[in-house]
């Protein structure tokens, strides 16, 4: 969504920070430290947007959200898609999350948000230059360390994100290689594409 939003702003003629950056998603992992890092070159967010969307939910307590999620999945599913709410499901597998982001708006300061998901968070300005977009570093719980293994991440990406129109790289290897054939005219499709789909 962040990349689509940036493309939309660019098509409108908006003056965008770091406009030379390719639109892409990069995923890294460290199976020794049990971390996953997800970065995009999308629209990013401002400090105010971070507080309004992620911070407000933190104040109300992601611990309560996770409790509701485990007790009554149907009721919670109605709000999962809202910005911020779905993000908090990361704390089902993470003991800490750090978000670093810089808005596409040229004069905005980059910010860092940090939380253990228990209701409090820290937000601070980032000194130095970082590129437009967002990086999320996930510190996994010991019992969920399998998600920091390459084969597991690759499997998840291929299952849930194979048809994303932007490239997704896992440790510099493009993972989403199947094009969304439903977007192509039938006359342009090859039998191999159809069979692979």
Regions found by a protein language model. Give the residues of each.
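GHKL (Bergerat-fold) ATPase N-terminal catalytic module, capturing the glycine-rich phosphate-binding loop
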Residues: 1-142, 146-147, 155
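ATP-binding catalytic core of ATPases
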Residues: 103, 120-197
